[in-house]
């Protein structure tokens, strides 16, 4: 119950710019005329609530950011809007407090925090411990550009241009950019659909598609970034090794030099990362400036006339014939193919997620990610196209590097464009021994530039910045994945340190993975490995955007509008296609890993709820199919037993729940009905609390069922509501399942009338009826009218029942005494299909005449064979109408004796009054009219004891008592007599007399 403290105020202070306690309580009293409404009121319980509402007679608050935020800002109390109970219920003053006379599910302090506490700190100064946040330029654009401008730009783009030619190189670049641009648009849409936290790509995919795909791609993406650290570090190490070799100072040998330099370099990068995001960001800005200077240096170098040394290496400045020759491809080596070049180049376009991966460190991710990412894609694309075109116009493919290879007078043979510029590289070209030229020399950009050390510095800046960005991305993404605890044994790496919650342990793990791949020491081997992982990530990002759009969920409202769901789908498909065109076996491995991780999360079912598009899609499918079912006419072949089970709280009836679930699981509808009895609907607010608890209990027990509760004045009216309102369209119950009322002889007669009345109501609503009785009882009357604290339901130990275990090689005995449409046969058939009941033998017992036993048995066997149920053992009971034993008859008479009117010698008026006052009692006339039927129940019990004492389950046709002609106590006596003294569970079934089995094919 929410409490609002009331402070005593003098009369002249009863002024309010918002509301007063007097108007709040009285509802009609206006404020005093002397009030100065320009001053804030003190009648707001000592709070600033008056700042959050307006007008008189209301505690409604105006819209505010705090009401929708999941957490309060640092230094501020949590603020919440008033609940519906606060606004709707009557407020009663008791002493100095106002009590809302309604159930409030929130803790009392939460309301106080929201409505009463002073909003101090709303304009509080920035906390000195607040983490560093970046804008779109420094945080996203520069970071993405640095990650895109990696080792491939300087060391492989000239070589790719020589292999593929300028035209196909542009096609490779534009194809890569098309994929990344579409992905960039998808990332922009997803990142602007709500507040983005840390976790980058993993956070965006997991919150869009759900934990299943999000978790798998998060793990793969973190791993791909860790391998990316190795790729860029190896590129840096190659450059340093070449410099050492040119100066004649190698460390060991070419391969081991790369390994040594790479490990030392990645260790330094680890130290920078551990210093914090602020230092890492400063290092990135420095690298960016170095790269820009190196670009300018390269472009100036292409304009400077070639020196003799550069000419010997194939550089002749801009010439049209060089440009024309380099337009077409000249494939060489094992990687000499379009997709071979594409697989090597594509990782250089994959840095578009570098900004999104530090989403938790951005000031406004929703603005920074779209703007910075798309600008980075644009500028880097221009740079790639420009470098490919310019270097392809200046440098020939083959050159010896020997300054003496000039053309000499004489008849010697000279081939190639270099001949026109006075150089003869024919010998090395024919012998494939040229060490220089566009296709042979990886450091061509350095050679072309005006000042080679600046290109080397650019290579250092590009490789180190990309490696640093990948290291940070890998750790940040993995940290968020660890915090969500979707996978076991990784929570250790999720711990954050310092004001920025730096993932130190994640850095160390990424460092270890990077070192392992640096040992490979071959850039062309590492690059294709991560291409598939990045493409897999892009495919899922695009699919996330498409899926969220196609579900038409009201929650999908990205502020970034320049995206297309069909472009996103195309991006997803083309990413998968490219994966297989690049390296089909690596694509299969990547998809296999994703599927394995996906199935693991599906199996574990983590308790997270992120409002994913998968959930929205599930709703759409369910809605579409449910509406579609309305157009389908009922047919016997499509009949399914859809059960409304009167469990009360399901945890009070585990045996009943388990039994019904056995034949409805994955087949039909099961609803656990619960009637809360309360006059005047006083317990309405409880429903939302207890419903979630009971649903979680069902889920924990792995029962596929719905929980439905209603509040009613009495049990019978509540069940009537359930029977009429439960279900949706064709998905409505057609069978009412109840437990046997074991205490009917001692219970209040009104509850007995309700119980039998419920059965009559079920038949009136055209329901079939099943009554389950177990020897140990089900506590029907208590369970149907009681409930437990919902918060304790999930924690309580799950009660085991006999229906959860194997039933062995016992029998399921079916007493098909009367034809109810076939429901008495269908339910045991469905049970027998389940593994727990599969070893049981089914026996069918029918009534018959002793002189026609064989004929009747053959007739029933023939009928059962037409139903294709697989029931072959049939027994005919010829003595079903024999008189029962005297002592059993006597026991029945003793059972009904307390419920008799004994009206045989009373006048008619007295008898009529007695029947009106005691409708459950049995008159002498009713006993006489139903004597044969009563004796039949006694005799049937004797037969059950003779034939089915050791059965796993007894199923028999439920007798029907005619409404108004059979008192409730007599009917209960029949049910009691039928099922008493039996050890196996007994299920009494009566269909609605409509066929549920057919032997026709249409």
UniProtKB/Swiss-Prot annotation:
Keyword Transport: yes
Keyword RNA-binding tagged: no
Effect ascribed to mutating residue 404 to Q: Abolished N-glycosylation, leading to reduced localization to the cell membrane
Phosphothreonine carried by residues: 44, 48, 53, 58
Phosphoserine: residues bearing it: 41, 47, 71, 89, 124
GO terms, biological process: cell volume homeostasis; chloride ion homeostasis; chloride transmembrane transport; chloride transport; potassium ion homeostasis; potassium ion import across plasma membrane; renal sodium ion absorption; response to aldosterone
Binding sites annotated in the UniProt record for Na(+): 146, 149, 462, 465-466
Extracellular side: 242-253, 302-336, 392-451, 521-525
InterPro entries membership: AA-permease/SLC12A_dom, AA_permease_N, SLC12_C, SLC12A3, SLC12A_fam
Topological domain ranges for the Cytoplasmic compartment: 1-135, 188-218, 359-369, 476-505, 543-565, 598-1002
Binding site for chloride: 351-353, 538
Binding site for ATP: 646, 653, 675, 739, 778-779
Tissue: Expressed in kidney, predominantly in the outer cortex in short tubule segments.
GO CC field: apical plasma membrane; cytosol; extracellular exosome; plasma membrane; vesicle
Annotated effect of mutating residue 424 to Q: Abolsihed N-glycosylation, leading to reduced localization to the cell membrane
Post-translational modification: Ubiquitinated; ubiquitination is essential for regulation of endocytosis. Phosphorylated at Thr-53, Thr-58 and Ser-71 by OXSR1/OSR1 and STK39/SPAK downstream of WNK4, promoting its activity. Phosphorylated in response to IL18.
Glycosylation sites: 404, 424
NCBIfam families in UniProt: 2a30
Record note on quaternary structure: Homodimer; adopts a domain-swap conformation at the scissor helices connecting the transmembrane domain and C-terminal domain. Interacts with KLHL3. Interacts with IL18R1; this interaction is increased by IL18 treatment.
Family assignment from sequence similarity: Belongs to the SLC12A transporter family.
UniProt name for this protein: Solute carrier family 12 member 3
Organism: Rattus norvegicus
Phylogenetic placement of the source organism: Eukaryota, Metazoa, Chordata, Craniata, Vertebrata
Originating gene: Slc12a3
């Amino acid at each position: 119950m929410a409490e609002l403290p009331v402070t005593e105020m003098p009369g002249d202070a009863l002024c309010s710019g918002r509301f007063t306690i007097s108007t709040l309580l009285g509802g009609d009293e206006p404020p005093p005329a002397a009030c100065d409404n320009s001053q804030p009121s003190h009648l707001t319980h000592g709070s600033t609530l008056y700042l959050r509402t307006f007008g008189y007679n209301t505690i409604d608050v105006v819209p505010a950011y705090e009401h929708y935020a999941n957490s309060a800002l640092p230094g501020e109390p949590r603020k919440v809007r008033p609940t519906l109970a606060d606004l709707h219920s009557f407020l009663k003053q008791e002493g100095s407090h106002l009590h809302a006379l309604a159930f409030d599910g929130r803790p009392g302090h939460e309301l106080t925090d929201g409505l009463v506490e002073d909003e101090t700190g709303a304009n509080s100064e920035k906390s000195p411990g607040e983490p560093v946040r970046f804008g779109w330029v420094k945080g996203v654009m520069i970071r993405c550009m640095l990650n895109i401008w990696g080792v491939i730009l300087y060391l492989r783009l000239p070589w790719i241009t020589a292999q593929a030619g300028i035209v196909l190189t542009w096609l490779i670049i534009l194809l890569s950019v098309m994929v990344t641009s579409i992905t960039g648009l998808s990332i922009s849409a997803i990142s602007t659909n709500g507040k983005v936290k840390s976790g980058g790509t993993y956070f965006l995919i997991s919150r869009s598609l759900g934990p299943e795909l999000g978790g798998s791609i998060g793990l793969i993406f973190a791993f791909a970034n860790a391998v990316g650290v190795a790729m860029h570090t190896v590129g840096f190490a190659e450059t340093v090794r070449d410099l050492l070799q040119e100066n004649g100072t190698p460390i060991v040998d070419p391969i081991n030099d790369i390994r040594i330099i790479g490990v030392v370099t990645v260790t330094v990068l680890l130290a920078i990362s551990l210093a914090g995001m602020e230092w890492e960001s400063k290092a990135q800005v420095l690298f960016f400036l170095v790269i820009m200077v190196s670009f300018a240096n390269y472009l100036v170098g292409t304009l400077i006339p070639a020196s003799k040394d550069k000419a010997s290496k194939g550089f002749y400045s801009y010439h049209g014939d060089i440009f024309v020759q380099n337009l077409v491809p000249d494939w060489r080596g094992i990687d000499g193919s379009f997709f071979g070049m594409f697989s090597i180049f594509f990782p250089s376009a994959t840095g578009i997620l570098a900004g999104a991966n530090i989403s938790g460190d951005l000031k406004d991710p929703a603005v920074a990610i779209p703007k910075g990412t798309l600008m980075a894609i644009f500028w880097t694309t221009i740079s790639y196209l420009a470098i490919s075109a310019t270097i392809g116009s200046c440098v020939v493919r083959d050159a010896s590097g020997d300054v003496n290879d000039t053309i000499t007078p004489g008849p010697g043979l000279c081939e190639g464009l270099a001949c026109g510029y006075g150089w003869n590289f024919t010998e090395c070209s024919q012998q494939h021994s040229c060490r220089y030229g566009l296709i042979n020399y990886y450091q061509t950009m350095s050679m072309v530039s005006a000042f080679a050390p600046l290109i080397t510095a650019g290579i250092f800046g590009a490789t180190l910045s990309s490696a640093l960005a990948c290291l940070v991305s890998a750790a940040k993404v993995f940290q968020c994945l660890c915090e969500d605890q979707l996978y076991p044994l990784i929570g250790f790496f999720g711990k954050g340190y310092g004001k920025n919650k730096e993932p130190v342990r994640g850095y160390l793990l990424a460092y270890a993975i990077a070192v392992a791949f640096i040992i490979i020491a071959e850039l062309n081997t590492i690059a294709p490995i991560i291409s598939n992982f990045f493409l897999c990530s892009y495919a899922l990002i695009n699919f996330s955007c498409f899926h969220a759009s196609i579900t038409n969920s009201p929650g999908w409202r990205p502020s970034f509008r320049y995206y297309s769901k069909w472009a996103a789908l195309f991006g997803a498909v083309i990413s998968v296609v490219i994966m297989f065109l690049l390296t089909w076996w690596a694509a299969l491995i990547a998809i296999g890993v994703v599927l394995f991780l996906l199935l693991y999360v599906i199996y574990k079912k983590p308790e997270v709820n992120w409002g994913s598009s998968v959930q929205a899609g599930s709703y759409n499918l369910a809605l579409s199919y449910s509406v579609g079912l309305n157009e389908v006419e009922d047919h016997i072949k499509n009949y399914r037993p859809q059960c409304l089970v009167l469990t009360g709280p399901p945890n009070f009836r585990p045996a009943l729940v388990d039994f019904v679930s056995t034949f409805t699981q994955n087949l039909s509808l099961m609803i656990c009905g619960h009637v809360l009895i309360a006059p005047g609907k006083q317990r309405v607010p409880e429903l939302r609390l207890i419903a979630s608890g009971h649903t979680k209990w069902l889920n924990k027990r792995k029962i596929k069922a719905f929980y439905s509760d209603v509040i009613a004045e009495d049990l019978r009216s509540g069940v009537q509501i359930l029977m009429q309102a439960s279900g949706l369209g064709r998905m409505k119950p057609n069978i009412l399942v109840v437990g046997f009322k074991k205490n009917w002889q001692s219970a209040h007669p009104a509850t007995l009338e309700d119980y039998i009345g419920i059965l009559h109501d079920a038949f009136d609503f055209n329901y079939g009826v099943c009554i389950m009785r177990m020897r140990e009882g089900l506590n029907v009357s208590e369970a149907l009218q009681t409930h437990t604290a919902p918060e304790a339901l999930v924690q309580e130990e799950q009660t085991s029942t006999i229906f959860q275990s194997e039933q062995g090689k016992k029998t399921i005995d079916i007493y098909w005494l009367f034809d109810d449409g076939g429901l008495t046969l269908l339910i045991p058939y469905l049970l027998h299909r389940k593994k727990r009941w599969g070893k049981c033998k089914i026996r069918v017992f029918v009534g018959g005449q002793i002189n026609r036993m064989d004929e009747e048995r053959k007739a029933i066997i023939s009928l059962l064979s037409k139903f294709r149920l697989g029931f072959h053992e049939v027994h005919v009971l010829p003595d079903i109408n024999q008189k029962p034993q005297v002592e059993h008859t006597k026991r029945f008479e003793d059972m009904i004796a307390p419920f008799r009117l004994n009206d045989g010698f009373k006048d008619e008026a007295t008898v009529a009054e007695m029947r009106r006052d005691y409708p459950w009692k049995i008159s002498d006339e009713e006993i006489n009219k139903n004597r044969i039927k009563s004796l039949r129940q006694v005799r049937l019990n004797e037969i059950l004891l003779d034939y089915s004492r050791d059965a796993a389950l007894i199923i028999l046709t439920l007798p029907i008592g005619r409404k108004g002609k059979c008192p409730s106590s007599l009917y209960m006596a029949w049910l009691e007599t039928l099922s008493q003294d039996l050890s196996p569970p007994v299920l009494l079934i009566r269909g609605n007399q409509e066929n549920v089995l057919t032997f026709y094919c249409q």
